Structures are given as C-alpha cells and as structure tokens.
Amino acid sequence: IAAPSILARYFLPKLLGRFQDMYPKTKFDVQIAQSSDVISLASSLGIHFGFVRNDFDWREDERVLLTTNHVCAVAAQPFKLEDLPHMVRVDYDTDQYYQNLLDGWWHETFEDSPIIGTRVSNLDLCKEMVFNGLGYGILPSILIEEYPQLYSIPLVHKNGSKLERKTWLIYKKELLDLRLPKVFLEFVIDSDFDSFQRNH
C-alpha cells in the first residue's frame, strides 16, 4: 500500500486496524509517497493499492472514490477572504497537481501575489505554524477538524463551486486474482471511509 502522508496519518491506522481485526494474519507494507509517486508505483505493480488525493488520469474501472474534502483558508485570528493578499501566508511543499490547483484558485480570485512569510516541508507543519499564529494557511478540511479554535473559510471558485480534493483508491485489476487484495478492495468499498478518520 502507498499513500500520501496525510492519508497515512489520518485514515490508514484505523482502516488497516479494522481490516486486521477481521483477517488477523494479514501483514502490511505501507509506503509514504506523494500522489504522483503513488500513481507510478501502482502503474508498475510495485504496490497492490494506492491512495491518492487528486484526479489523476486513471482507469475508471480501477479506482474507487472514497471521500471529498474542501480546501480552506485557515488562521488563528478572525479574517475575511479578501484580507488574504495582505496577510502573511505559511506555505508548504506539495505535489504539482495540488500546487496548480491552489495557484489557479489564487489567480482567479486575487490580482496580487501571496505574501509568503514561512515555507515548510509539509501540511502538518503548516497547520502547527498557523495554530501558533505565524500566518494563514491553505489546508484541506480534514486537517483542521481537530482544531475548532482555528478560523477557516472554504475556498470557492468564481463559478460558485468549492475547491475540493478527492481521495481515491487505485489498483490494477490483475492483482484482484489474488484473494487477499480482492477481499481488501471489497472491505474498503463497503466501508464508510470517513469513519476511519483519526478524530472520529
């Protein structure tokens, strides 16, 4: 199994734990990778299953939509969306697909470039910096649910649609000839993926 760190941290422990309760002899090999790298691993059959956070080009009959999360502007103090170009942002490294999504939203919404005050290596560190008042962040809603004291505003495109990130399970059909991968896929499909979130 391969997954981005946010999914590995917030969803996989409970998901894999429940599956192992049903099939105690199951062993897992879990790799942390950005969604684009998960796609490469799944394409080369380097993994049985991949969890990805983007709408990559993958066969419809070899993927399952698990959940959809909104992307929000988040800060430790109250703010309005129109304040963002004048506020300091905590930015983070992410895969190119998501970066393009965020940049596209920003440029359709504001004329000025964002003021980057701090750059960190990942989403979790960005969240902690925001929590401690170092600036605002643009974060997926699943990261901020455990911090109700933070102020958040969902990002919306000019056409009124919310900025979202979908979570997919991807696989290759030929691996379903093996019993355990087939059972695991059925388990994930039959489950409420959001129930595996860490703070639920």
What is the predicted role of each segment?
Residues I1-W58:
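Central regulatory/effector-binding core of bacterial HTH transcription factors
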Residues M22-V30, E108-G117:
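A local structural motif
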Residues I1-A2, V71, F79-N100, D192:
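Short loop->beta-strand "edge-of-pocket" segments that line small-molecule binding or catalytic clefts
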Residues F11, P154-N199:
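A late-sequence structural motif
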Residues A33-M87, L143:
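Acidic, Gly/Pro-rich loop/turn segments at junctions of secondary structure
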Residues V88-E111, D177-L178, L185, S195-R198:
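Secondary-structure junction motif
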Residues E62-T67, V71-C72, S141, Q149-K166:
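Short beta-strand->loop
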Residues Q34-V38, S43, E111-V156:
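Hydrophobic hinge/microswitch elements
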